[in-house]
Amino acid sequence: MKFVMILIAAAFVASPAVAALDGAALYKDKTCNACHGPKADKPLMPNYPKLAGQNAAYAEQQMKDIKSGARNNGQTAAMKGVMHLVNDEEIKAIADWLSKQK
């Protein structure tokens, strides 16, 4: 029995299950929809960017730059306050989801 448990544990460690993050759910859960709209195509304010259809790599880098402070202007003040809630994997998932929206 001990041997079986060791085999199960070894198999679990050897094959890490990487669950795909749900970009749509993260977009909502991280409150992106509050300013950029439910589908990222109708921002709350005219000066907020439409994110639907944005290039994934560009969107990912912009979010990372806002989070790190590398992009720091008047437009980023509100986002800076919430980006600490989003990790790099979640940023990538959100950016990928945004790129697939129309």
Where are these regions (language model features)?
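The canonical Cys-X-X-Cys-His
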Residues: T31-P38, I94
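Sequence context surrounding c-type heme c attachment/ligation sites in exported
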Residues: A20-N33, A52, A56-Q61
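Small disulfide-bonded, cysteine-rich extracellular recognition modules and tandem repeats
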Residues: V13, C35-P38, Q54, V82
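Electrostatic cytochrome c docking/interface patches
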Residues: F12-K28, K42, N47
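Positively charged n-region of N-terminal signal peptides that target proteins for export
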Residues: M1-M5
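Axial heme c-ligation environment in periplasmic c-type cytochrome domains
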Residues: P43-A52, D65-K102
